[in-house]
Amino acid sequence: MKKILLVLFLMLGAVSLAAPSRVNVAKIQNDGGIVLIDKSNAYSFIKLIDENSLLAVTYYVGELEKGGIKTVSESLKNQQLANGIEYISSGETETGYIHKLYAVEQGYYFYIVIGKNQKIKNYVVTGILQTAEEYSSKNDLKAIIELAVKEGERYLK
């Protein structure tokens, strides 16, 4: 579990103190979420999905650069590759983009999800599912996208 948290901290960055106004921090904490990042332009928390899986949800706040959500998706994927994590594949549904990565040393798969549609303008919802399980079917990957986006949107006011 310590390795899991360490990897997530390395992937998501440092902690500060000022959550975006549209994120329901109290509800996240009441539901057992653990804060990773707390800034005015980004908020992130992790939640245990089952005994082998964690979901880290991050809200990025601000104007999107040229290229929109697709650019954010590629940027997040490329940041993780710089950390020595292997790229496996990518996909997309109507709901979001997904990138499948593998951390050889830790033996974990990371599924990075970026929601396509912004429920609130200038709030981009991302999720990283960390698990020992490998999911490859289109239905499994679609379910991961749905899980991450649904969990993220659940805590927006």
Language-model segments: residues:
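Sec/Tat signal peptide C-region and signal peptidase I cleavage site
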Residues: A14-P20
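Secretory pathway targeting signatures of secreted, lumenal, and periplasmic proteins
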Residues: A26-I69
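Signature of long, low-cysteine stretches enriched in small and polar/charged residues
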Residues: Q80-Q118
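Short glycine-aromatic motifs
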Residues: P20, G32-L36, G84-Y87, E153
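Short, solvent-exposed coil/turn segments at beta-strand boundaries
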Residues: N30-D31, I49-N52, T93-T95, G115-V124
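Surface-exposed amphipathic alpha-helical segments
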Residues: N24, Q29-I34, T126-K157
